């Protein structure tokens, strides 16, 4: 392409993690489920235990985390931060260990969960932490010591619970410490995406 082209040829013999020649086959269907619960219920702790449990079953897992506050994964003074501060819409940082793409909204609306999922590589299962107002199926993480009300009576998208006390009603549940049982609930209630 000429100087105004929007793509650059890449030698096909150059393997990289983005286009690995021996990459596992894409799953036939990507499935999505969320973890919903009050702060302090243990969503992140549970997720950190679920991921290796699901991976051990041969299930490729990715996650989406909603942040309620402004956040920055970059470091002031680093080149990538300087690029963003100068007005770059997106900045990609890559190394031999990982790569990350940062997109600046610059006043645009926060992206919907469906828009974020569309940008992810296909995997077997995406577990969403947050986005509790979205309609994707969820497992409620509830801890009695938090003294917070249950979410499932007001959210029909909650299909099961991971809890230290039985939920009211007929909601299927597993004990918070029973990670294998919670993994079973997640797999039973995850929905295909796009639906």
Show the residue positions of the predicted features.
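Short hydrophobic alpha-helical segments enriched in small aliphatic residues
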Residues: 17-23
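Hydrophobic anchor at the beta1->P-loop junction of P-loop NTPases
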Residues: 35
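The conserved Walker
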Residues: 39
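Conserved lysine of the Walker
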Residues: 43
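N-terminal phosphate/diphosphate-binding loop that engages ATP/GTP or pyrophosphate donors
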Residues: 49-111
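C-terminal accessory "lid"/substrate-recognition subdomains
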Residues: 56, 124, 175-195
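Phosphate-binding/switch loop-helix module in NTP-utilizing enzymes
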Residues: 104-133
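Short, hydrophobic beta-strand segments that form beta-sheet elements in well-ordered domains
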Residues: 126-128, 138-143, 157-164
């Amino acid at each position: 392409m000429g100087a105004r082209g929007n793509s650059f040829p890449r030698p096909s013999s150059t393997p990289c993690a983005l286009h690995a020649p021996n990459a596992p086959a894409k799953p036939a269907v990507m499935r999505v489920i969320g973890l919903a619960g009050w702060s302090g219920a243990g969503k992140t702790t549970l997720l950190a235990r679920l991921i290796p449990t699901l991976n051990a079953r041969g299930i490729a897992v990715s996650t989406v985390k909603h942040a309620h506050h402004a956040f920055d994964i970059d470091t002031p003074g680093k080149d990538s931060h300087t690029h963003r501060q100068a007005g770059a819409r997106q900045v990609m940082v890559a190394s031999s260990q990982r790569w990350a793409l940062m997109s600046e909204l610059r006043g645009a609306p926060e992206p919907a969960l469906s828009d974020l999922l569309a940008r992810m590589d296909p995997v077997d299962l995406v577990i969403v932490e947050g986005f509790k107002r979205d309609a994707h199926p969820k497992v409620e993480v509830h801890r009695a010591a938090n003294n917070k009300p249950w979410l499932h009576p007001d959210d029909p998208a909650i299909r099961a619970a991971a809890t230290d006390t039985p939920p009211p009603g007929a909601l299927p549940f597993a004990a918070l410490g029973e990670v294998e049982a919670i993994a079973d609930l997640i797999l039973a209630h995850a929905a295909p995406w796009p639906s």
